[in-house]
UniProtKB/Swiss-Prot annotation:
Transmembrane segments: none annotated. It is found in: Fimbrium. The keyword Signal applies. GO terms for biological process: cell adhesion; cell adhesion involved in single-species biofilm formation; DNA damage response; response to antibiotic. Gene3D superfamilies: Fimbrial-type adhesion domain (2.60.40.1090). Disruption phenotype: Deletion of the operon under classical laboratory conditions does not result in any major effect on E.coli capacity to form biofilms compared with the wild-type strain. Residues 1-22 form the signal peptide. It comes from Escherichia coli (strain K12). Belongs to the fimbrial protein family. This is Uncharacterized fimbrial-like protein YadC. Keywords: Fimbrium, Signal.
Length: 412
């Protein structure tokens, strides 16, 4: 009778206990299982915005398919902020299977440097997406090696999580010892680098908006497909999307320009007072600069002069826009561009498309084509002088003088 009792007692003790597996499996999904062992109830969906303020992507005009040097970085993205959680399980059914990366990015049919290029919303503009430094809370690490994984390159992309924190293993994952019990570790933290490529189809309009094209409502996702029998029934997705709502495209440009010089007041160059004799004998030129600032990827600079009023006899002069008995007559203003490494001293003829003042920016900006979020632009002064001249043979009559003009600066 004593032997039978021990046998029955052994069975009773055995039937009340679950076996902790030698393996730890991982699944992902929403945050419904945080603090209750239930695991995710459905998928998690989140959208990360690049910036909350205006930003510009600046590209050169392409001559062939190739990289632009423009990259956008998202660092320490945490799916936990959008309710996407990584869970562990150590039941007897646990299988240490991988996490699969899937994507809904739109393949362009083009490749460069061994990587697939994916479409954006702008024709001729493509991108690659690199995921790197993937981890979770409690120093839960992955086997992803540097530089990371280019999402979408091969059809099957997987990586493995592993627990390095002994407390997480013994006080967390090991308590999830049945197929329907899960310990919530935290969000999947990772870095994303988007690099842009262009070809000759790229011809953006001014301030054109761009988005990364997708065939669904996400760009990439995480899911465990083989965490173990019955464990897999609780496995869901984490879907990740990006918006570039505050990002605009532009070709090389300077975002700010101001008029500077000792005779400058706001947007006005004050010429001073002159006698008719001084004007006839040659008035002193008044120097001024157009200071181009926050210049991104600028090299060549071309300036043209446009006005609504030129001289009566000498059309190279800016004419007086004032009329009436108090207006000066017989004079105009000559605008000259000072000598540069690209251009000798020259007269900038108003309304003449062939009269172009040329300068060149030698300094490199530090923005990598993303402004103002990544680094600083350069500054470049354009040097000019304005001289009051007699308008042909028209008699000079004293009075007030005002000329207006627009300097059209482009970056070919």
């Amino acid at each position: 009778m004593k032997t039978i009792f021990r046998y029955i007692l052994f069975l009773a003790l055995y039937s009340c206990c679950n076996t902790v597996s030698a393996y730890t499996s991982f699944i992902v999904g929403n945050n419904a299982g945080v603090d209750n062992y239930r695991g995710p109830s459905t998928a998690a969906q989140m959208t990360f915005n690049y910036t909350s303020t205006a930003s510009n992507l600046v590209f050169y005009k392409p001559t062939q398919l190739g990289p632009t040097g423009v990259k956008m970085y998202w660092s320490y993205l945490d799916t936990g902020t959008g309710g996407g959680i990584l869970y562990c399980n150590t039941s007897g059914r646990a299988n240490p299977g991988p996490i699969t990366i899937e994507n809904a990015m739109v393949y362009s049919g083009k490749d460069y440097g061994g990587h697939k290029l994916f479409n954006t919303s702008v024709p001729g503009l493509y991108y690659t997406m690199l995921i790197s430094r993937v981890w979770s809370a409690y120093d839960t690490i992955t086997d992803i090696q540097s530089p990371g994984i280019y999402i979408g390159d091969p059809s099957n992309q997987e990586f493995f999580f592993s627990v390095t924190d002994s407390d997480l293993q013994t006080k967390g994952c090991n308590k999830a010892d049945d197929y329907d019990k899960f310990w919530a570790i935290g969000g999947i933290v990772h870095n994303i680098t988007v690099e842009f490529y262009t070809d000759t189809n790229f011809d953006p309009t001014l301030n054109q908006q761009v988005q990364l094209s997708s065939s669904s409502n996400y760009l990439y996702s995480f899911k465990a497909y083989s965490p173990g029998t019955k464990v897999v029934d609780h496995s869901n997705h984490i879907y990740v999307n990006f918006t570039l709502n505050n990002v605009k495209l532009t070709l090389p440009t300077c975002f700010t320009s101001i008029l500077t010089g000792p005779s400058v007041n706001g947007s006005t160059v004050r010429m001073g007072e002159y006698s008719s004799g001084t004007i006839k004998n040659g008035a002193s030129p008044v120097p001024f600069d157009i200071s181009l600032q926050n210049c991104i990827r600028v090299r060549n600079i071309e300036t043209k002069l446009v006005t609504g009023k030129v001289g009566t006899q000498n059309t190279q002069l800016l004419g007086n826009t004032l009329t009436g008995s108090t207006a000066a007559k017989g004079v105009g203003v000559l605008i000259e561009g000072l000598a540069t490494s690209k251009n000798p001293l020259m007269t900038l003829k108003p309304n003449d498309t062939n009269s172009v003042y040329i300068d060149y920016e030698t300094e490199d900006d530090t923005s990598d084509g993303v402004y103002p979020n990544q680094g600083n632009g350069t500054s470049q002064p354009l040097h000019f002088q304005a001289t009051l001249k007699q308008d042909g043979n028209i008699a000079i009559e004293p009075g007030e003088f005002k000329a207006t003009s627009t300097f059209q600066v482009t970056y070919p």
